[in-house]
Amino acid sequence: MHHSFYGAMVLWVLGYADQAQHWGQDELARAQQGEPTPSLASTHLFAALLAQHRRDVVATRAAAEATIALATTHGFAHRVAQGHIMQGWALAMRGDAATGVAQMAQGWEAVQRTGLQLYRPYVLALLAEAYGQAGQPEAGLPCLAEAVTLVEATEERWWEAEVSRLQGVLLLQRSPADVDQAEACFQQALDVARRQQARALELRAALSLSWLWQQQGQRAEAHALLAPIYGWFTEGFDTADLQEAQALLEALRARDAGGPALPPLP
């Protein structure tokens, strides 16, 4: 039943955000026909995952709330917990980081009690990102270290590049003195994404690395890295990642011409 959502997430990773969105919307529309069924909670959860991939906070929260409501009605404890994780991430990204982190941590503990193994590196990466939003990189970095261990133990590598990128982000947030280690994390994320042909994650890694390089005065190198990666995309230009890439490229060009300062680290 959820094959379309798995396909949609693959399309997103490969760089086809609009096609992924259409697949996901079609699957959700089919699932919503007729009376609500227990499996509809799972469908809404997958919709939340896809929205989170797109960094669509509003859609993530709405789908997470639908997941929680349906899973509660049908007694799906693990889906309730997963819904709380996604809802917490959305809250953290919207500015209520303390509430979001607490909700995610509670949901993560509940998921662990179920013994569910799938998506654990992904969830830990979301939790680490939320800790970063809360200004607690020192709490987020152990989550990412655990995610790395799980990736190696389970070979669940689809979010590996993002785990490495977020390590770099949180290292810089913790201390500017960690710049060399952060740069290595961004480069590793870029290398992993390229090996996997994960264009969406390659773009994120390039964004972070390009931002760091321009901070170090390497604006030409930053532009040379990011421009061809951005230029590959043919859709998804309304997504946060592509909009940030466009803004960074424009700022790099403007900065070279004596324009305003560059945007903050993605």
What do these predicted regions represent?
Residues S4-P266:
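Helix-coil-helix junctions within alpha-helical repeat/solenoid scaffolds
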